Amino acid sequence: MSKLFWAMLSFITRLPVPRRWSQGLDFEHYSRGIITFPLIGLLLGAISGLVFMVLQAWCGAPLAALFSVLVLALMTGEFHLDGLADTCDGVFSARSRDRMLEIMRDSRLGTHGGLALIFVVLAKILVLSELALRGEPILASLAAACAVSRGTAALLMYRHRYAREEGLGNVFIGKIDGRQTCVTLGLAAIFAAVLLLGMHGVAAMVVTMVAIFILGQLLKRTLGGQTGDTLGAAIELGELVFLLALL
C-alpha cells in the first residue's frame, strides 16, 4: 500500500519522491491507486494551507491566498489547470466530437481555455480571502477541498469510457470498480468531516459530488467519454465548488 501511495504521489504531483520507494509496481496496477487520491489531496492542501498561514500575518489574506494557489498549482505541475484549459477549449469550440478531441490535444491556449484559467484562479483567491475574513480555518479548508476534489474525480472514472485511443487518463478511466469508488469517496468524506468538524464539511462534499457527477454526464454526452484533461478539469472545479460551498 505504501508503494502504491508513493507511486501515485510521483504520478500526479511534482513533489520529489525517491524512485526506489515505488520500484517494482507495474503500470497496469496504477488504477488501484485511486484510493490514495484523497490522501494525496490532503497533503497538497495542507502544504498550500501552511503557505497561507505563514504569509497571512505578513502580507494579508489576499496575497496569502494568491501565493497558496500558486504553490498548489506548482506542486501539481499545473497539470490540472492545463486539463481545465484544454477541456474548455475543446468543449466550447462547438465543433464535432472528433474535432473537439483534436483541439484538446493542441498545446496552444485558446480563448475559452484562457478565460477558464483566469476565472478559476481568481475565484479561488477571492474565496480563500473571504473564508479568511469570516474566520474559517484555511489550512483545514484547503486540505479538505483538495482531498474531496481528488476523491470525487473517481465519479468520472467509474463506469465511464476513455474517449481516446490512448493516453495517461486511460490508466484510471473505466478501470476502477464500485468498491474502489466507494472507498475513495468514503475517505474523502471522512477527511472533510474530521477537518471541518462534522456536517459542514460533509455538506460541502455532497454539493461537490453532485456538481462533479453532473459535469461528468455532460462531458460524456459531449465527448463520448472522459480523458485525462477532463479529470484535471474536474479536480480544479471540484476544489472551487467545495470552497464555495463552505461560504
From Swiss-Prot:
Gene Ontology MF term list: adenosylcobinamide-GDP ribazoletransferase activity; cobalamin 5'-phosphate synthase activity
Enzyme category, top tier: transferase
Pathway of action: Cofactor biosynthesis; adenosylcobalamin biosynthesis; adenosylcobalamin from cob(II)yrinate a,c-diamide: step 7/7
Tree of life domain: Bacteria
Cofactor(s) the record lists: Mg(2+)
GO cellular component, one term: plasma membrane
Catalysed reactions, semicolon-separated: alpha-ribazole + adenosylcob(III)inamide-GDP = adenosylcob(III)alamin + GMP + H(+); alpha-ribazole 5'-phosphate + adenosylcob(III)inamide-GDP = adenosylcob(III)alamin 5'-phosphate + GMP + H(+)
Topology in membrane: Multi-pass membrane protein
EC number annotated for this UniProt entry: 2.7.8.26
Transmembrane domains' residue ranges: 34-54, 57-77, 113-133, 138-158, 194-214
Keywords: Cell inner membrane, Cell membrane, Cobalamin biosynthesis, Magnesium, Membrane, Transferase, Transmembrane, Transmembrane helix
One GO-annotated biological process of the protein: cobalamin biosynthetic process
Annotated compartments: Cell inner membrane
Known role: Joins adenosylcobinamide-GDP and alpha-ribazole to generate adenosylcobalamin (Ado-cobalamin). Also synthesizes adenosylcobalamin 5'-phosphate from adenosylcobinamide-GDP and alpha-ribazole 5'-phosphate.
Annotated family: Belongs to the CobS family.
Name recorded for this polypeptide: Adenosylcobinamide-GDP ribazoletransferase
Lineage: Bacteria, Pseudomonadati, Pseudomonadota, Gammaproteobacteria, Enterobacterales
